[in-house]
């Protein structure tokens, strides 16, 4: 496993410990990717996982671009359409560094 895969596994475990239910991971389409799909009661949660081994370039929180946000949103819309679902949903970010994890809920 590479560091990104390890970070996604750690994020999944963390979210499950917070009471979320795992649905899917690494959902890829030509126009975007979703790292984790979780559920919190009836809300579907699309999670982008960002990991940085240091804060040299602003850390994990600064690693998400507007282009990436657009691609994640498109992928989530496509996923829901393919599954024929129309649930309430939100977009979260798990920002991880070597020694901390930050869960930002509903951040885009």
Swiss-Prot record:
Pfam families: UPF0102 (PF02021)
Lineage: superkingdom: Bacteria
Record InterPro entries: Restrct_endonuc-II-like, tRNA_endonuc-like_dom_sf, UPF0102_YraN-like
Entries under Gene3D superfamilies matching the protein: 3.40.1350.10
GO molecular function list: nucleic acid binding
Record family assignment: Belongs to the UPF0102 family.
PANTHER family from the UniProt entry: UPF0102 PROTEIN YRAN (PTHR34039:SF1)
Protein name per its UniProtKB record: UPF0102 protein Sfri_0388
Originating species: Shewanella frigidimarina (strain NCIMB 400)
Phylogenetic placement of the source organism: Bacteria, Pseudomonadati, Pseudomonadota, Gammaproteobacteria, Alteromonadales
């Amino acid at each position: 496993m590479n560091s990104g895969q390890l970070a996604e596994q750690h994020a999944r475990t963390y979210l499950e410990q917070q009471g979320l239910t795992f649905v899917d991971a690494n959902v890829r389409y030509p126009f975007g990717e979703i790292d984790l799909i979780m559920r919190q009661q009836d809300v579907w949660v699309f999670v982008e996982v960002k990991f940085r081994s240091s804060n040299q370039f602003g850390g994990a929180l600064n690693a998400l671009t507007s282009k990436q946000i657009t691609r994640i949103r498109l992928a989530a819309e496509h996923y829901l359409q393919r599954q024929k679902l129309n649930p309430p949903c939100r977009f979260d970010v798990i920002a991880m560094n070597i020694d901390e994890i930050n869960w930002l809920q509903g951040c885009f």
